[in-house]
Amino acid sequence: MEYDCGFTKEDKWFRYRAAAIIIEEGYVLFAGNERENYFYSIGGAVHMGESAEEAVKREVFEETGVKYEVERLAFIHENFFEGDGSLEGMKCHEVALYFLMKPRGSRELNSNSYTQGVRETMHWIPLDKLSDYRAYPTFFRDKLKNMKNEIEHIITYEN
């Protein structure tokens, strides 16, 4: 059995997450589901004993049905937010490593992913229209347009 790197203590929730930035033909890939009214980045919890790079490749394949390769680590994101949905009432703290994935030259996917029992859907959102969508993390709106060739550390407080 695999164990996620994270814990809950009273009304506090922490997770160590690996996530992907997948850009193809001017579009960035996000996930969504029928329970949430927003889009979120592709990725998930790192398992105990698993590297973040291994985790992001596993999560991308689980969610998209496609094997992407990692280009490089792009962002270290510390996110503080009030939980909703299954995390309702929780004070959440997430540390996520965002990896830029190597483009494949195709937006074709083979997704059959579920999260917490709900089917996930994949959405290609135009980079130049990202600010028109309720999509997380919000720093993607500015940072993906002019990505630096270095690792950036970002701290956000999102409610």
Predicted features along the sequence, with ranges:
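Conserved Nudix-box catalytic region and its N-terminal flanking loop in Nudix hydrolases
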Residues: E24-V66, F75
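Active-site-adjacent beta-strand/loop module that shapes the phosphate/pyrophosphate-binding cleft
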Residues: F81-N110, K143
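Charged phosphate-binding loop/patch that engages nucleotide di/tri-phosphates or the phosphate backbone
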Residues: Y136-N159
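Short connector loops at helix/strand junctions that flank enzyme active sites
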Residues: R15, I23, S41, Y68, ...
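Acidic, metal-coordinating catalytic segment for phosphate/diphosphate chemistry
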Residues: M1-A19, E25, M90
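Conserved hydrophobic "DFG−1" position in protein kinase catalytic cores
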Residues: I22, F30, M101-P103, W124
